[in-house]
Amino acid sequence: YFCKTVFMILLFVSVISCGDSKSKNEIVELPAIDENTETEITVWSWNVAAKALMETAKTFNEKYPKIKVNVQEFGGAGQAFERYGIVLASGEGIPDIMTIESDYVQSFAEKYPKYFLDLKSLAPSDIDEIVDPSKVTTSYDSEGKLVAIAWDSGPVVMYYREDLFRQAGINPDSIVTWEDFIRIGKEFQGKMPNVKFIGWPFVQDDGFWRDLMVQNNVYYLNRDGDITISSPKAVESITILRRLIDEGLALNTVNWDGTIRANKNGEVATYIIGAWWGGTIKDQMPEMKGKWRAMKMPAFNLNGARASSHGGSTLAITSLDPIKQAASWAFIEHSLLTVDSQLLMYDKFGLFPSYLPVYDDERFNTADPYFGNQFYNQLLGEVTREIPPAIFTSDDYSEVRNIAVSVYEDILNNNSDIQNTLNNAANQISSSTGRKIAK
């Protein structure tokens, strides 16, 4: 689902015009609310995320029975983002809470700062330590306002067919680094020539490249906003993808439907992706129960990170009314910063929690029959804690991504020189955005 919506998002966010000039929103102490507070708040979200908030609204109303929570469901993130741009630009019809994908928080908060409440004084003082570390950098704006609270995460793991590995005599524990992955992949395909060792789309979505960059503690921009798409670590990251193709280990699954089909039909032995994929295969491939397992992704070196981030969303308060702001914060706190609500949303809707205390709850750490009674959740929790805090985005992130997707396709499909192509991309981003290229 994430891959299907990425281009609509890029399109809609890219057409958001420059909005209000940056002015720090003066934060005042919010009025106290209790069970007698009577108001109504509107929350915008999409698909299963919207349905999850409808569920947490029910338990929220046990404490605040007179606060009505209206959750408006959009068909997808792209559709929602298009509407966000319209209402924020006009200043009319803005909801009290917006769901925003983590990488796109600054695309809205930087352009329309007066509508984004600074949550720093409301959130726990240790908020940066109790959520997915990869979500911290995307939750603040350039002035240091905490404009969003992390909701769900996409810790990246390697899904693999345990039955195929067993048939080929492959021990998955022998895969520690990317060099191991390539070596074992050749061995696997030598024994099972009709199955590719890995698959992913070579076109349209740069997600796998971004996964490897985050793992390698780099992104398109660094903390200072300088361009790092042509840095040695970015080059190293996409070089791995080219090697997998050049070594004949990779299947181009082209798009979302092709990816589902390849995994369902046994055309690939592994798939490296965010944890939301686990829910996808349970839904789309129930007949494969017991055949899949998950493990940490290969590292760039023996001491390197075996974790990354792919996807996930946040909640932001965009109301200007103090009572509605207070009610909105109470709802966000109830939904995102309590173990019970996060477990509810994960168990019922597959939204993997960004809230780290969930990982220590005994209800979370249970064996998963679909993955051969593996302690799957425990693995995902370990990976999330280890994700490098490498994701830095900006108000012009959509422009950067559009250029990145173009060069990603050129490198993987046209065999273009990697360093030269990324140098050109860095120059193009610099020309388009005025940003400096990191030295």
Which residues does each PLM region occupy?
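Extracytoplasmic "Venus flytrap"/periplasmic binding protein-like
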Residues: 59-131, 167-169, 176, 267-270, ...
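Long, aromatic- and glycine/proline-rich binding clefts that accommodate carbohydrate-like moieties
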Residues: 35, 137, 295, 346-405, ...
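Extracytoplasmic/periplasmic solute-binding protein
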Residues: 138, 142-151, 156, 179-226, ...
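Short, well-ordered beta-strand elements
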Residues: 36-48, 67-72, 96-97, 147, ...
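Glycine-centered hinge/linker elements that transmit conformational signals in sensory
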Residues: 184-187, 224-253, 297
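A bilobed periplasmic-binding-protein/Venus flytrap-type ligand-binding module shared by bacterial periplasmic
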Residues: 159-162, 310-323
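A structural signal for short loop-to-beta-strand junctions that line the ligand-binding cleft
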Residues: 86, 94-98, 125-164, 196, ...
